[in-house]
Amino acid sequence: MPILNEIKLAKELIRFPSITPVDAGIMKFLEKKLKKLGFKTKIIEFKEKNFKPVKNLYAKLGRKGPNFCYAGHLDVVPPGNLNDWTVNPF
């Protein structure tokens, strides 16, 4: 199994302006990383009337238990006025 550099990955993830419902490519990016680690992946899009679709990434490794489930999010809080930042928040 390839080695994962967590700090490098965190820096790469932070660069995505993934403000819901726009994922800015972060789902495909993470899906590619997980596939390289041997995960089977699927991006599922949830649609609800009067709302923009939201994507979720489902990844599975192995076949037998015991099982571990991680639920998290890839979106960020809107940065507000970019002129108020001394550096690009992404």
Task: Set out the residue ranges of the language-model regions.
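Homeobox/homeodomain signature
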Residues: 3-4, 9, 47, 64-67, ...
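N-terminal hydrophobic or amphipathic helices/low-complexity stretches enriched
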Residues: 1-23, 35-38, 80
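Active-site metal-coordination/substrate-binding segment of hydrolases
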Residues: 67-90
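A non-catalytic alpha/beta surface segment that caps or lines the substrate-entry region
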Residues: 19-65, 88-90
